[in-house]
Regions:
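Hydrophobic alpha-helical transmembrane segments of multi-pass integral membrane proteins
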Residues: 31-68, 72, 76, 80, ...
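Juxtamembrane and boundary regions of transmembrane helices in multi-pass small-molecule transporters
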Residues: 84-143
């Protein structure tokens, strides 16, 4: 699956699909500024990670994150970090990360057990990341 996503990520970059998606996202929320766009980028990453593998989401969204930054004329690092942190925040389903799948089966949990604890944690990390990422990785790097 990851190999297929690598090919898809490369194809998105080569064909301009990443630019098209980035332009759509920045057109929708870019007028609110880079902080809101970063927050939405993180949110997209964490939601997609709950549905497919976190590695696949990282491969798919990283080229889009770079295009978003380029479209907005800001440093790409905060957007790349938002994608990586969002992909790592897979707590609301047993699908997004291998460890969740292991404990799902071995622990005898139900699917509905994951969102009860994981969704509030995802929301908390979304808020914290949206605040702290621009502090540690500014949109305009210091000279």
């Amino acid at each position: 699956m990851i190999l297929g996503m690598l090919a898809l990520g490369t194809a998105m970059e080569t064909t301009g699909a990443a630019h098209l998606i980035a332009s759509g996202l920045t057109g929708a929320v870019g007028h609110f500024g880079p902080a809101v766009t970063l927050s939405v980028t993180y949110l997209v990453a964490t939601v997609l990670t709950e549905l497919i593998s976190n590695n696949a989401v990282a491969v798919l969204l990283t080229p889009i994150a770079f295009e978003i930054a380029a479209t907005m004329g800001v440093d790409a690092r905060p957007f790349a970090v938002a994608v990586m942190f969002g992909c790592a925040a897979s707590f609301a389903t047993p699908i997004g990360h291998q460890t969740n799948t292991y404990v799902f089966g071995a622990g005898g949990y139900r699917f509905s057990d994951f969102p009860k604890i994981g969704a509030p944690l995802n929301i908390l990390l979304w808020i914290v990341a949206s605040i702290l990422i621009p502090i540690f990785w500014p949109f305009v790097p210091k000279p």
